Regions:
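Ankyrin repeat domain, specifically the short helix-to-loop turn at the C-terminus of the second helix
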Residues: 18-26, 51-59, 84-92, 117-126, ...
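Ankyrin-repeat-protein effector appendages
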Residues: 1-4, 143, 150, 154, ...
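Conserved ankyrin/ankyrin-like repeat signature
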Residues: 16, 48-49, 81-82, 114-115, ...
């Protein structure tokens, strides 16, 4: 029955999902990767199925063996529609990625500007959360990207929404120093405006 449930979720077949649940399927069943039907629907951009599953008792915050849930999935894979839906459904913004960051961290690092803007302007997500190596979203956006115009806008967005430019990584290195080390002089100038 679970294979049918996962297939129906992937296809967004709400009628099949309804029938399976009426016949005893577990709405929070897990596949080999610990994915639930709602995560499978989310990964396949089946937004109506995501909403339906959530409204019928699916746990929207359950994470798979890679720490993905629908919210983290949307943040990492630049799916603004999914991120907005999960926030609307009341997802837990404190769920962490496998590296210990919240959804803002990979969105900033990967240059998903619209998601970063949405999260900062519409939620109370922790902009200064540190991951397993002491990196904030601000630090990740500097270290793991190209320093280009999009990243400059993201850096400014983070700083405009109270990212702390004095927080250092676990080795005591500041965002300003990291920007200079990477040769990102424009980002360094932006950070200096907030010091």
């Amino acid at each position: 029955m679970n294979v049918k449930l996962f297939t129906a979720a992937a296809e967004g077949n709400i009628e099949q999902l309804r029938l399976l649940l009426e016949n005893g399927a577990d709405i929070n069943a897990r596949d080999k990767g610990k994915r639930t039907p709602i995560l499978i629907a989310a990964q396949n951009k089946q937004y109506d199925a995501v909403r339906w599953l959530a409204s019928n008792g699916a746990d929207i915050n359950t994470q798979d063996n890679k720490c993905f849930n629908p919210f983290i999935q949307g943040c990492i894979h630049n799916d603004l529609t999914l991120v907005k839906l999960m926030v609307e459904l009341g997802c837990d913004l404190t769920c962490l990625t496998r590296f210990g960051g919240n959804g803002l961290t990979p969105a900033a690092e990967k240059g998903h500007e619209e998601i970063v803007r949405f999260l900062l302007e519409n939620t109370d997500i922790n902009v200064n959360l540190t991951n397993t190596v002491g990196w904030t979203a601000l630090i990740e956006a500097i270290i793991l990207n190209d320093g280009g115009e999009k990243m400059q806008r993201i850096i400014r967005l983070l700083l405009d929404h109270d990212a702390d430019p004095t927080m250092t990584d676990e080795w005591g290195v500041s965002p300003l120093e990291l920007a200079y080390r990477k040769g990102y002089h424009e980002i360094a100038k932006i950070i200096e405006e907030y010091l």
